[in-house]
Structure formats: C-alpha cells, structure tokens
Amino acid sequence: NEIKPVIEKEYPILEPCFGHLKGSDISNAQELFDTHMAEALYHDGKVCGYIKAAHDIDVNLSAHTMFENLVVKASGVLAAVELVTKNDINRDDIDYVIECSEEACGDVNQRGGGNFAKSIAEIVGLQNATGSDTRGFCAAPIHSLIEASALVKSGVYKNVMVVAGGSTAKLGMNAKDHVKKGFPVLEDVVGGFAILISENDGVHPVLRTDIVGRHTVKTGSSPQAVISSLVSHSLEENGLKITDVDKYSVEMQNPDITKPAGAGNVPEANYKMIAALAVKQGDLDRKELANFIKEKGLVGWAPTQGHIPSGIPYAGHAIKDLTEGDYNRVMFVGKGSLFLGRMTNLFDGVSIVMERNDGKMEDESSVSSESEKDQI
C-alpha cells in the first residue's frame, strides 16, 4: 500500500490509528462501482481504494452518502491536527468540540443524528472531550464561534474547539458550473478549519459576547434589513459606528472561482452593502465609499464550499492583526440560506466582534480566541 507510509510520515500524531490501515485487493471492485455499492477513490488517475455502502437499502448509509460524510470527517481531522500540532496545544486540555459543516450523518430512522464532532475528537485523540454538531447552512461557523465563546465565558468548559470539514457536494456543484461555461474544473481543494476558544489569558484577542448581531425571525430578507441586523444594530447598542471596526470578514469566497461560475464577486458585494449602510446612517461620506471597501474589506481567497468561506477564514489573520498589527476591532459575519432545506423561507445570519486584548483578565464580557489554523 503506497498511501499508508505517507500518512505515517506526515501525521505521527495519528499513530494510534495506524493499526486500522490495512491494504486489500481492489482488482475486482468494478462490479461494486457499477451497482453503486461503492464509490471509487482515485489518486493520480488510478483507483487506489473505495468506500462501500454501510447498508444495503438505507440511502442515508449509501456509498455516496458515506463518501461525503467521510470527507467531512477526514478534512475536519486534518484541520484539528494542524491546530493542535502547530500551536503546541495539549490535546487533553480540550473539553468540548463543536462541528459546524453542512453535512448530516445518521440512518433512516434519524437522518441527522450526528455526531461529526465526537468522531473527529476520537481520531485526533482529544481523550477528555465530548461535543456536538451545530448546523445553520453557511452561518453555522459564526453560530459556533458564539456558542463556544458562551460556553467558555459561562465557565461550563475551559477550552472549546470549533471545527469543520469540507464539502464534496459543493466541489461538484462548482465544477459543474465551470464546465458548463467552458472552463476547466477551477476549484480542486477540500477546505477545513479549526479554532480553539479559551479563557481570557490577557494576551490573545477577545471575542466580545456583548457585541453580537443576529438576523431574527422578524428581520425580513431585504439586503438593508439583513446588513442592519448583522452589522449596525449590535454596534449601535455598544456606542460604536460601522467605521469603528477596522476589518469586516464576510463571505470570503475567491472571486477567481465564483466569477467564472456566474456568481460574481461575493465579498465585494457584501462590502458595498455595509458601506452603503454606513453612508445612509451618516457614519461615512459618500465620496469615501470606495476607500471604505478597500480599507475595511478583504479580497476573497477561500474555497467556495458553503460554510468554509463564511466569515471564519480571517480568524487566524485577525489574531495576528490584533496582536502584532495595529487593528483594535474586527467583525465576523456569517449568513445562511435556510430556505434551501424547505422548512422555512427565512434567511439567517449572526455576527460577533473580536477585539485587541487590553490585558485586563477580569473582563467577563469576552473570551480569548487563542489560536487558529484554517484552509488545509
């Protein structure tokens, strides 16, 4: 088996799992592929393995679904491994894990029963952790960031990991759009991220649990109402203006990927709406619109896999900007299209502010965002 030595070399932290890696003869696998009882795994254009259906008739445990879910788990594991190894984090100190991708694992009787979080914790070796899955389409990462902050601030847990794997379904969707328009497959990566939220240490940036924006049931779906609920309302309640935030992290899709697919420049569109709201509220002169977008915005760079680009990719950079750089305040904004699930026509979204740590350990309105590694 050519794959096993590579894994053993690159990921020694996963050594307890190596005994489960056993090669097998796949020369007669074509029949399984033809009957959809297995999904092939390819490496360098050749079949190197396959994922079998976990049940004969349950579509929730079909080879296709198992493939999607195992990609979420595996990419989430890689993100969590990067987090703990590159930041020298003691795995035994992590109490709780929140997984916030957009897939669901379960069987015919409980299709979204879960739990990706616990399965990732098991492989990474987080022996003292439990966890659960949080879902909210693309808004889930920021929902999870707020939940993790609340759990730490309340004293329920000291260290909470927020993690998510990528989406093969979104890869396929994007590839389909590119090919349809005459382009090659432009997005060829699976995204993933992991963040550790810990108690305020007086050094790392703090998450302001008192500056949280939210799209409520009564908010509505107009762009102005959405941006107001997510950005300006929570700032105003704390005596701040839109211009008091140094950087906004919104839907950070890479425009080089989205524009050829016909989706435009998503981050830029978000920043234009925030800037327009600032002008309307008198926080910004209309002549400064373009400059606001340049100064307060970011160029999208993240894979376009739904939850992966939704606000969270800037977290690691924000830590650096709020410690080594000259920023004092940034905002993370996550939005989600709940109507895709056909349970409601409502939109969704939440936001939270991260600030430079002033060194005052007794501040109970914030927790420390200790470290982050994203985009595997």
Q: What is the predicted function of each stretch?
A:
Residues 1-70, 177-242, 280, 295-297, ...:
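Condensing-enzyme catalytic core mediating Claisen C-C bond formation in acyl metabolism
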Residues 1-6, 29-32, 36-42, 67-69, ...:
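Claisen-condensing/thiolase-fold acyl-transfer catalytic domains that form or cleave C-C bonds
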Residues 28-179, 185-210:
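Glycine- and small hydrophobic-enriched segments that form the cores of compact globular domains
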Residues 79-96, 230-247, 265, 321-322, ...:
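Phosphate/pyrophosphate-binding loops at sites that engage ATP/ADP/AMP, CoA/4′-phosphopantetheine
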Residues 93-100, 131-133, 158-165, 206-211, ...:
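Beta-strand segments within the central parallel beta-sheet cores of soluble alpha/beta enzyme folds
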Residues 101-104, 167-176, 217-221, 256, ...:
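Short, mixed-charge aromatic SLiMs
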